Each structure stands twice: as structure tokens, then as C-alpha cells.
Amino acid sequence: MPPFAAPVPDDEPPEPPKGRRPYSSPTAEPEVEPRRPRRVVNRPDKLVAGGPLSEPEPAEEEPETYQGTRIPPYVRVYPVEEPPETEPVPEPPEEQSEDDDEPGVRRVGRPPAGRPTRPDLLVATGPPRPQGSSGRHHRGPAPAAMRRAGPVRRGSRATPIVLSVAAAVLVATGVLVWQWSGEEASGLRLEAGMGRSGDELFTVPAAGDGVNQKLNDMASADRAVVAVGSDTTSPTPRPLFLFSPDGGKTWQLGQVSGVSTPTVQRVVGGDGRWLASGGDGSSGERGLWTSTDGFSWSAVERPGPDAFRAGDHIHDIARTASGFVAVGHTTGEDGGSGAAAWRSDDGARWERVETRGLEVREIRAVVAKGDTVVAIGQPAVGEGSRVLRSADGGRHWQATGFQLPEALPRTGTLGLLPKQFVLVPTRQRTVTGDVRVYCSPTGAEWKQCGTIGGLSGESPGVESLISHKSGVAAITQAGLGKYSVLTSTNGSDWNKRADFADLSGATLRGFTISDAGTLFAGGDQAASDVDNQLVLMAAPARGEAARVKLGEVEGLARIARETTALTSFSGRYVAVGAASGDAGLWTIKNWQSWKSMSLGGPGRQSLGDVAHGERGWLAVGATETNVAVTDPLLVTSADGESWKRIEVSGDLARERDHPYLTTHVVTAGEQGYVLAGESKDQAGVSRAAVWFTPDLRKFTRSEKLPHGGSGVHIHDAVASSDGFVAVGGSGAADQENSVVWHSDDGVNWTARDPVSPPGATSAGLRRVTSYQGKMVAIGTALVDGARRAFAAASDDDGATWRTAWLPAEQAAAVYDLAAADEGLVAVGWHGAPGEGDSAAWTSQDGLSWNRMALTKDRLAGRGMQWLSAVAVSRADDSGAEVVALGRSTTYNADHLILWTSSLSASR
């Protein structure tokens, strides 16, 4: 759908596991040190357990010393009206008349006033319910008769909400809901429990860290040097800002506040005004950040009411004497593209400027000298490039008469000399091998002023231009892993400034020359099949190029790790996910010790779900065998300890013209196992994929799916009394339709009516479980432009549903759902965006819910904490054991959370 949050006080970043090197040696020719090779599995039918791990001692309580800012990296914030204060509702009397035919109904907007007599317990009131099943993927007994309350009265509140860009993220806003008030003092009781660090528990033996970091651009002013990019190390991506206050002698991770996209593409600035822009170019998300010093950055969350629209994309930015300009394109509802431009005085408040009449369909590059701005775009008719000009800081634009029919416009085509503008066609050489250079003193009239010659025969031409204090520099790629930089002070005479050679597997994208004359280059390098690490090079004015030592930058290195699902059976818990680029399996029996298992093999691997059935355990996921191909990953175990990989063949194999096929959902019932995933063709068109196996040996792919499964994403599935039910959604995020499929045999599926709360314009289901013989699901809906989490319950295996909103007084997200005999438990977070704490919701009927604030140990504090996976298991006659996995993360720290608690129902 998934945030920067504070680590637990006193938690120091753990030592990197021995044998791992997050970064290479800082030399001019990067040293390739021996790395522990990826483990080869000689016995493919056996997986090796890492052995018992000792439980870490709880950290002592000490005052927090972290001074950074805290934001979620991949969420957008939508402000909505704050709820009005309401009078507290008095508690009902403990005793009621036996003559009352119906129990009362009361509204709940916040936790009841006063303190509980047991402050270590979190108590939720509600009606007594019959005993039921104890897992999201397990079917419970037939339902008992349910006594209905009197007339239901519902009220709602609007509060700030959050929409995450992580997969399957549910967002809830505040809402008043009704709850039961029975004749007995009954209800669910959820203990506050204990949270502890999971950093040392959820690891796997691996040769790399699974990191995915890139540098995309650089800028410098005076002694400040800034490098920007992205850190999409799953599952907590963040925008990347590196800062040097002393001309590149030392580097540190910048400070970032606010909520934004995790990818920064461009940066400009100096003299107290800096601007960065970003976005991934495919999802439609944009990001803008401002800074006064290049170190502390703030995301622009409200750029202006009419400045940006859906379909806008920023290609380039420039600093002017009066502020900043941005250029790009916009895509209309009909799919047509048009030029777009914006200006701002301070980088925080933006206005859209008129671009009609410029006869270009997009603007790719822009530079400014004072308030004279020059841009280059693609003509509305034909190919090539057309130059545009503004004389007033980007408020008004005119098309010049200068065009280059043979050159495509690209970012980096334009540069600045002290007295004139410079244009160099990128990746374009003449028949003689030279590159033409054009100059203009005003940006209106252009003429050729020189050529760049002597390029390598392997070079396609100039990759980009950069401007610096004394002139311009042209970047050329001489071959794979080889770059040359040429400089000029007049546009006609060019001299080689530096070579960056022997950068095997590296790509350089960002360049800058500081006022002191040091040339910097930034990019990334494939360090292994699961690692993509930063590259930052520095070449002094008089000296050799050398690699900047980034391994010592505090908070920069991260190890990819994620726990995606958790389930239990007969006293054993099994968690699945990924760590260091490999699929991860972790298990514990009777709380002796957690054991970790690694699958080995090439490619980036992950597991998304796990279930237990009559034939044993089955975990499903995906393997990225290369950047273009993804295959299903299935592993099975009879005892939860020894796991073996299932051969992907037959119906499990990809079609030849479909490079992408994954499995991310599994459930088990009396008939067998149902798996769900996604298939994509070469054009990127996706379809749902479903399989059934009765014995974990023969897998049958369903050929009969409603509408062929086109555009459908199945998020969860569960066994029902007469087969299986799968839930999910189809369509875009703001126009999603919920999906409910039913199958008698796990192979042939039919669609049932969509589930949508009243007034919702968009709705999708994310989790489903079986409880007391009925289906209970959690979903997300769009109402009046705001997202809310809702629950749905069905007594007839998904044929019809009743819905209710989940209570939340602030922004909230619900990630997982589990069922016990005592009731239902859902987990996620609640609070201010970027400052939320872990939260749990409980219910005894699937429709009336109570939110529990979890404030102890690692579950709350500075920053963002959340629980993402939950499982329940029968502990004893007094109640059920609740185990949840989660995360606590900041911009420069990231920790896993293990929470244990218990759930009981008083009668």
C-alpha cells in the first residue's frame, strides 16, 4: 500500500553480521574483496536451519538522545476536518432488568474515561461469543445463534488519514461506531504484553545485505555538497540525501521531515535556498523538498491548491533569482500528453503557469541565469527538440525559433557559461564522430560555437552537461564502467578533466564540480545478485579520482529484512519473509528458541504467506532470477523444522511470453491448499493466478476465473464450510472495486457481489478469516475523498456481507487479522502520520470493534511503530496467546519488533 519511526531508546544499531561488507573499499579503482559466496544447496531436498538463537536481553530504559526528524517514507497525507469534541458517554449500569428484551447500544469515540484497575491490561467490552477457530487460515465450527442488539446508531468522525505506497496497506480514519452492551459484564481482555527487538531473531545466513540504494543527482555551492537518490531497501523505502559541509572531506546522512515519495531525482540550490524533486515516473507520485542549508530537508506536502494535478510529472528544476522553476509534462484523462511548467518563490508554494501555444508536448530540461530561463522540449508535431524561453523567472514562456530536428530533448542537455547559455545534443554524434555545441547569450538566438571531439569509439556521445563556477562540463560514457569528463570555459575549447574507469557494474548519474574545483560523481553498483550499493567518486583539481568512503556514514547502511506473515499450529509458530535478499523462514516451538532457515540459490527471494494443512506446512513467495524475470517460490515442511523447495514446473511454471509470475497467498482447508498470485505479460498487463493442490505434489492452475482474472489482485483467501473464499480488489486505488470469489473445489471460481460500505466510492478487501463459522474481512474504502478501514462479516460464505467502520480517532492502518476462540484480533498502527504507535483492534462478532493503544516497550515512542503480522494460539483454558511482528523505523534507523500478549473473554 507501508514509515520512519524512532527506534527504542537505548537500542544501538546492531553490529553487522560477520562476513558481510555493506560497502566496498574507497579507492580510485574500487577493490573487489572476496565475499562469502552464496550458499549452494547440494541437497535440494533439505534446507539448513541456522540453529537456536539466544534471546536478547531487554534494553534498559534510558533517556532518548535521538535528535533527528521522523517521517514515513512512502505515505501521502490527506488533511481532513478535525472531529468536534463530544461529551463522554456514561457507562451502562452493571445490572440490567431481566425484562429488557434487547441490550442497549452505545457510541464509542475514544477509550472510556478513567483508569482501569489493572493498568497492565487493555480491556475491551462487548458481548459474549461462542468459542471459535484460532487462525486466519483455519475454519472454525458452525456459528451459534447470535443475539442482535436494538436499533443500530452509527456516527462518524473525520480525522487526518494516511495512504501508504506499500503493498496491501490499509488506511483508517477516525469514526464513531456502536458496540454491544450485554446483560453480563462480559468482554475481551487483551494484555499489554511485552515487546522486544527482533533484529537478532529474524536474520538468515547470506552473502549480501539485500540493499538497493542509488544516487541520481548532485549539486554544490560554496563548501556544501549534496547528493540525492533513493533507498528502496525493502520494505521501508526512503528518499536519500547525503551532505558534506566541507567540500567533500566528510559526509553524513541528511535530515528529512515530512511525508513524500522515496525517490529523489534532481537537486539545485545554494545561498540559503535549495530544492529537490522526485518521483518514480510510473506510479504518478511526485516529491518536492526544500532546504536552507542542504542538510535539513522538509517535504513539501501542500504545494498549492491548483499547482499540481493527477498526471503531472516533473522532469527538471532550476533556481532563478526570484525562486525556482520546474518543468515536465501532464497526462490527461484521454491519455494525451502536454507540456507543464511551474514556478515558486520559496520552493514550498507553487503556481502553475500557462504552456498552451508553446507547441511542445513535454519539457525535458531547464536552466536559469538570473530570471532568464531557458528550457528544451519535444515539439507537438514531429521529432527533435525545440527551445523555450522566459524572461521573468518562469512566469511567462515563449517558443524560440531554434529547433534541432535530429536531437531528442533530455535532462542534462542545457548548461550555463558565465556569459551565455550552452546546448549540447545528448547521445548524438555527427558522421565524423564529433558532438556539436550551440551557444546563446540570451537564450533567444542560437548558433554553433564549437564541437566536442576525440570521444571513444564506444561512446554514444555526451550523456549530460553540468554547470559550475568557471564553466560547463560534459559527461561521456567511454564504455561499460568507464566515464570521461571534459570541461570548457567558452563552449568551443574542451579539455579532459578526469576519467572514472574500472567501475565494473557501476552506473554514474549525478555530477557536480565544487567551488574548490573537486569533481564528484554519484551512482550505484551491483555488488552481488541481491545488493545494489552506492558509488560516490571524488576527483580533486590536482589529483587522481578516488572512491568516497561511505561505510562510515552513520545511518546509511541498512539490511533488507521483512516479516510478511505469521501463523501457528499445535504450539509452533512459523514466520516468513525475506532478509538480506534471501527468503526467510523462522520457527519456534513452545517458546524454546527461534530458528532461522535460508533457502540458498541465486536471485533475490522472498516469501509472502504460510499456512498449515493436513499435509503439513506450505510457504509461498517469489524468486527474481534476474531483473526481468520473476518465478514462483514454494517450500514445504512436514514438521515446520525441515523445509524443501517444490520444483516449479507444469502448472506452476511461467508462460514463455509472461516474464512475471508470483505466489503471495496460501490457505489450507479439508480439501487441500489454495494458492493465489499474479501474472504479468510483456506489456505489463496483470492477471490474478490461482492454484489448487490436494497433496502438495500435484498443482492445478485454475483456468476458470471471473473475467479471466484481468486486473484483479487477490490479497487473501480462507477455507469456508463448503470450499474456499478469496478476497481482493480490482481497478486503480481511487476507483477500486472489491473482489469476492468462491470455489467449491479450489479450481473453479465464481464471483460474488462486491463488498462496499455505505457511501464509499472505492473499496477493496485486504484480509479475511473464518470465525465462528462465518467470514470476517478487513478492507479499505474511500469516502468523501478520505480513506477508512472497515470490517465486513458474512454468515453465508461470502454471498452477502454486513459492514462496519473500524474505530480510530487519528490516522490509522490495519495490516493483519487473526481469529481465536475468544474473538478476533487485528493489528496495525494509530496516531499522527510519521508519529504513529502500534495498535490492536479486538472484536467478538466481526462488526463491533474496540481499538487498543499499545504504549509499552518498543510498541510506542518517538517516531513510527506498527505491527504487520499476527497469529493466535491456544495457551490454556484461560485464553489465547497472541504473537505479532512489526517494525520501528526512522530516517536513519530501522528495527524489527516481536510482541507477545494474551487474549481472554470474561463471561
Language model: regions and residue ranges:
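Short glycine/acidic-enriched loop and turn motifs that connect beta-strands
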Residues: 231-236, 280-284, 330-335, 379-383, ...
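Beta-strand-rich domains and repeat architectures in extracellular enzymes and scaffolds
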Residues: 204-239, 264-265
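Conserved Ser/Thr-centered positions that define the repeating blades of beta-propeller domains
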Residues: 244-245, 290-291, 343-344, 390-391, ...
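Hydrophobic single-pass membrane-targeting/anchoring helices
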Residues: 142-187, 422, 519, 618
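Repeated scaffold domains used in trafficking and secretory/extracellular systems
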Residues: 211-217, 260-269, 308-319, 358-369, ...
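Entry beta-strands of beta-propeller and related beta-repeat scaffolds
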Residues: 220-228, 272-276, 319-327, 371-376, ...
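Blade-level signature of beta-propeller repeat domains, shared across WD40, Kelch, NHL, RCC1
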Residues: 510-512, 520-522, 527-538, 542-545, ...
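Short loop/turn motifs that cap or connect beta-strands within the blades
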Residues: 200-210, 253-260, 300-307, 353-359, ...
